[in-house]
Amino acid sequence: MFEIHPVKKVSVVIPVYNEQESLPELIRRTTKACESLGKEYEILLIDDGSSDNSAHMLVDASQAEGSHIVSILLNRNYGQHSAIMAGFSHVTGDLIITLDADLQNPPEEIPRLVAKADEGYDVVGTVRQNRQDSWFRKTASKMINRLIQRTTGKAMGDYGCMLRAYRRHIVDAMLHCHERSTFIPILANIFARRAIEIPVHHAEREFGESKYSFMRLINLMYDLVTCLTTTPLRMLSLLGSIIAIGGFSIAVLLVILRLTFGPQWAAEGVFMLFAVLFTFIGAQFIGMGLLGEYIGRIYTDVRARPRYFVQQVIRPSSKENE
């Protein structure tokens, strides 16, 4: 049996991108939730290249008297998951909680995640109840969740919810993975011995708009499909085999019909031939696109460029910048 260590210090990691309107309330509510734990805690806010006043607000929050906030400033926008990984590299707690800055997932849920982690779970995920998102966002999320479950075999209900808790050894394992395209919830489940999901509230977004546009959702889908599994390549091979067998069967059938009914009938089968041709061409383009995605990711990983660059770190215990 593995020994269950009680949680002594909690680190809350929050990526921030153009969230100046929600930051004061985010800091207040997150601090209050952490204070109620009766444990040591720190709140790491990672500015992901914001173009508004978010970075300055984070610095001020870190330098306030009695602050528990660590501000990490990235030199440009790298994306949500890269920003979270930057936060992971600076945590000091033995339980790490991730949270979005838009307050749609209430910080008041943090004590529930800590309590569940204290039961011995490596990863505590969450499922949003009564989602307050648009029809498009909810539909896209359902499709992505089903796609992930089928391609990875990991049966989790809501991969899109970033309100999650990870034991320190899970975070350390993820930090040893150097691929640039990373989807943290799936990566964490690969290393987790015990994982669980709990239902959480989901509120409407009070400030600003979602940072995930249609194209960013498409990019996220490609990341999910190609960065953690080779299942699409296997499916492509299976699909190619089915199409090839089907095309060969149709060709044989056309030859038999021509021999049976004469060349006059064959002229009327031109459209069928075109349909078969277009099917093959379409399948080739799909295959080339997927292979291109994998080759592109191999090229990116071979270059071994860092997934993020930390420009500045401000800790509350010292007014000096790292």
From Swiss-Prot:
It is a multi-pass membrane protein. It is found in: Cell inner membrane. Keywords: Antibiotic resistance, Cell inner membrane, Cell membrane, Glycosyltransferase, Lipid A biosynthesis, Lipid biosynthesis, Lipid metabolism, Lipopolysaccharide biosynthesis, Membrane, Transferase, Transmembrane, Transmembrane helix. Its EC number is 2.4.2.53. Residues 257-269 are periplasmic. Its main location: membrane. The keyword Nucleotidyltransferase does not apply. One of its GO terms (cellular component) is plasma membrane. One of its GO terms (biological process) is response to antibiotic. Catalyzes the transfer of 4-deoxy-4-formamido-L-arabinose from UDP to undecaprenyl phosphate. The modified arabinose is attached to lipid A and is required for resistance to polymyxin and cationic antimicrobial peptides. This is Undecaprenyl-phosphate 4-deoxy-4-formamido-L-arabinose transferase.
